[in-house]
Each structure stands twice: as C-alpha cells, then as structure tokens.
C-alpha cells in the first residue's frame, strides 16, 4: 500500500507539472490540461484516497480468508524440532482447536466485511460484491456451527476437519465448499476494488485526445 500511495503522490506531481494553467481563471484546486480540460484535484484526490482505503480494507479480509488454507496444512500434524510439520499418529484426529481457529478467523473477516458497502465513494457494483462476500462468510460459519457433533470437539477427526476447512478436499460437505465459495467472492471483490483505484488514478493520467484537424479551409 505504501508503494501505491507513493505512486499516487508522484502522479499528482506529474499532473501539476504537465498541466497548462493558462486560459480561463482557475480555482485554487483546479488545473487545466493542454486541451483546456479542467481537473478538480481536490475531488480526484479524494476519490483516489477513498478507493485506496477501501482496497486496503478488502486486502485485510483476503489475508484473513487465505490464512485458513495455512491452517488446513496443519491437520493431523505436529511441529518438529527443526520447525517443520510432520504427521504423527499421536496427534491424529485431534483438530478441535484447529477448527475453532479457522471459525474465529472467518468470524473476524465477516465483521470486517460488515459496513464496507457503506463506505463513501464506492460504486454499486462494489457494494454488490461486498454483500456477496459477506453472505458467503455467513454461509461458511452457519455450516460449521451446524456440524458441532463432529467438529465442535477436541478429537475432531482429520477426515471431518478436511471436509470443513480444506477447500481442495474431494469431500467438502462440512464447510469446505462454502469456504471455497467465500474465497472466490473475496478474490472478485479485491480485483474490483483494485480496479477502482486504477480507474481513479487513470482519471489523472489519461492522455489528452488529439483534436482532429479542421477540414474547413
């Protein structure tokens, strides 16, 4: 995000350098391009700031959701002295805490998604994607809560745990299917959010269209 902000600052500087302030009298926050197009830098800068802040919030959600994949890698394993993980019969079918951790992570992600559709300056398309991602997070949480007989205990089996949090498992009937759908929704939301940032920046950097030469002599 720091690199993105630095790029935005540099873009604003380039706009100031490249814009022609001649012609009609401009307000303090306005600059004119060489074709006479007037840019309201205050409005454009606000749009970039809002889009960047929204994208950063979505990135936090994505990081949380993707972290469940890392938890899934620890199913039925223990830590070795060298810091790596290995399967161990003594630790087999003891995944209750692992499932609880994954559940809590998605619960936090759901909380972060709430209210994102109320953020200033975001498009209706983005609002719809936020709503979809939030619905997918609720679906996962509801699915896992409905499986407490097998998942809500200390000795949750490796097989049941994979069905719950391993989204590439062959059997996804205890939550993994909903988790996969949540990942897809969050990926789409992040892509759209980053697209809004790029669009806002492009508003500053879009080249001026060359005027067609007049055919009237």
UniProtKB/Swiss-Prot annotation:
Pfam families linked: Lipoprotein_6 (PF01441)
Record's compositionally biased regions (Basic and acidic residues): 155-174
Residues with lipid group (S-diacylglycerol cysteine): 19
GO cellular component, one term: cell outer membrane
Main location: membrane
Residue numbers with lipid attached (N-palmitoyl cysteine): 19
Membrane topology summary: Lipid-anchor
Keywords tagged on the record: Cell outer membrane, Lipoprotein, Membrane, Palmitate, Plasmid, Signal
Keyword Lipoprotein assigned: yes
Signal peptide: 1-18
Location(s) in or outside the cell: Cell outer membrane
Domain of life: Bacteria
Region listing for Disordered, in residue ranges: 151-174
Family statement: Belongs to the variable small protein (Vsp) family.
Main function: The Vlp and Vsp proteins are antigenically distinct proteins, only one vlp or vsp gene is transcriptionally active at any one time. Switching between these genes is a mechanism of host immune response evasion.
Additional facts recorded: Genes for both Vlp and Vsp families are on (usually) unnamed linear plasmids in B.hermsii HS1.
Protein name: Variable small protein 22
Organism: Borrelia hermsii
Gene name, Swiss-Prot/TrEMBL: vsp22
């Amino acid at each position: 995000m720091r690199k993105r902000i630095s790029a935005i600052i540099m873009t604003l500087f380039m706009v100031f350098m490249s814009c022609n302030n001649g012609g009609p009298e401009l307000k303090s926050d306005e600059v004119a391009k060489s074709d006479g197009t007037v840019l309201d830098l205050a409005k454009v800068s606000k749009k970039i700031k809002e889009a960047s802040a929204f994208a950063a919030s979505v990135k936090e959600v994505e990081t949380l959701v993707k972290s469940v994949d890392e938890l899934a890698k620890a199913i039925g394993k223990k830590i070795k002295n060298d810091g790596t993980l290995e399967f161990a019969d003594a630790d087999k079918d003891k995944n209750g805490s692992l499932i609880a951790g994954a559940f809590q992570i998605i619960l936090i992600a759901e909380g972060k998604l709430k209210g994102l559709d109320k953020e200033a300056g975001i498009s209706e398309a983005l609002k719809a994607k936020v709503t979809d991602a939030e619905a997918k997070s609720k679906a996962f949480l509801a699915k896992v809560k409905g499986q407490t007989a097998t998942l809500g205990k200390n000795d949750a089996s490796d097989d049941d745990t994979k069905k719950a949090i391993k989204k590439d498992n062959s059997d996804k009937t205890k939550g993994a299917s909903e988790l996969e759908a949540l990942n897809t929704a969050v990926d789409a939301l992040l892509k759209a959010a980053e697209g809004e940032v790029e669009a806002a920046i492009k508003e500053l950097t879009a080249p001026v269209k060359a005027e067609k030469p007049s055919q009237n002599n």
